[in-house]
Amino acid sequence: MNRPWLAHYHRATLTIISDSPAPTGGAAPLSAPLWHQLQLVGSVLVAIRAGTSGTAAFEAVDPALRPGVQALGFRVLRWLGRAEALRRQLAKRTPPPPADALLCTALALAWRAEDSPYEPFTLVDQAVEAAKRSPVTRAQAPFINACLRRFLREREALIATTDRELVAQWNHPRWWIERLRRDHPRDWQGILTADNAQPPMTLRVNVQKVAVAPYLSALSAINLVAKRVTESGVQLARAVPVRQLPGFAEGEASVQDAAAQLAAPLLLDGLGRAAPLRLLDACAAPGGKTAHLLELTSAAHVLALDADAARSRRIGETLDRLGLADRARVLVADAARPQAWWDGTPFDGILLDAPCTASGVVRRHPDIRWLRRESDIEQLAMQQAMLLAALWPLVRPGGRLLYCTCSVFRAEGSHQIDAFLAHNTDARLRPSPGHLLPQSTSDVRGVPDNDLGDHDGFFYALLEKSAR
């Protein structure tokens, strides 16, 4: 089946979108009637159910209305399994897609009364109003009204009934839940709980421009509470638009999850930060890890590859803002075909941030769980293996390759590396984190002593080539 949305989400580095108002800058959110916002969320849900990525679906919304619609939409996507189970209890027949999306939107927003953004009666009233005001749902307005009024009357009993359904309880597809149970029998519930939580806003401080302690002081001076995480990261108590961050436009900080910030130091520390290193970032867009490598050493030069021209432009934009463009070369190329771009000189270090299911960043992209198919895992694992096989010969003897994915599935992590080591006797696994589970509190091997804080799911394996 052709699923064009897949291109948006098979990368380990993703554009971060958030529940919080306008985290990436722009104008202040414009208020709109709730019924209109519910219409827009319903339209986004229809698009996602048809195979459009959440990123693309939300980008189709008027930019002035997008922050509010996105905040509601993320909540709907996080509780969609429960909403669909409730709808099945309320309706003997499935309504047409626009009406079903609007009904599920209202149910997802209303079922948890303790943290609902609006009173349940208000949501019901405005959902019915939304149905009446659209020609595609007007005929179903009485049906939607009847279902939602019944939900208000029988709320506790209906929720108790759906509690017995695995998908309703955890709000992930059944195959996903069962896969996590096999892969992480002690941690699967914690992973799913983390997936349904709102992620923090974490920054990486550009230590080429400012140290972490002064940057924390600058945040405190404008009443932004933050704590230090990782070597050069800070985590905010609440998300804010980047335009409010001190020195953001001047390149003093970038938005990057704490787990993602481990990549650059893991690769560099074994090679020596003062050495004139030749580095490759094999799947580099949008450029955050390339930039971090350059921020941590002034002696390295990085070749940053990405097969997508539009995404490659974002690498350049990232490096320009941070003042690092003069020490990197950005190339549009397929990392799996080095014969088309490699000059024959081995690299001291390679960062392979491989295409993956992005199952570790579901809390930032809650649509992923509903778009993925279990067959995607096998397809992506094959692509990852091809990249490892193509890039390993490019590492000099004694050099290192850091393999990472933002996935919690073992097929894309530990199983992938076990297979690689079995077929490459010149490779050995250095101390590295392995599977970092979302909000994991377990001991992490190969991670600096600094607190990781609240982080996404990642996998890291640091491979060293035998010296001849």
Question: What role is predicted for each listed range?
Answer:
Residues 1-468:
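S-adenosylmethionine
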